[in-house]
């Protein structure tokens, strides 16, 4: 099996695992993930955070976003662009749309853009992960291209335990 085939199989297994969670499991897991991240020093110290709007059964960080905003942290969300580029955008009050892949995303023209080197913490959705916490994404490479430019940020993959492959 090639690496590409392995990743495709891991991706499929991870998506199936997160979709198989019951509503109760999902609610508990989302709360536990948010609490665990908020207890980390990297979250406590972060001023600028890139997170994501959950899609397709991904771990939902809404509770974390509410608490981070209450603490005065700046929250940016990814906007997928041409050439598989990613932009960190802080949405305005009416600055949301359904963007690429049907994901809720900030409207760039109504958002403040943060440079990658301005980010302190990047929370990345995982489709699957392995025993040594290597991330498998959706396969387009948006984060793979973006993360190396986040030179001062702590980068954390976010997934449910059920997504371990």
Question: Where are each of the predicted segments found?
Answer:
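N-terminal active-site beta-alpha-beta segment that forms phosphate/nucleotide-binding
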Residues: 2-118
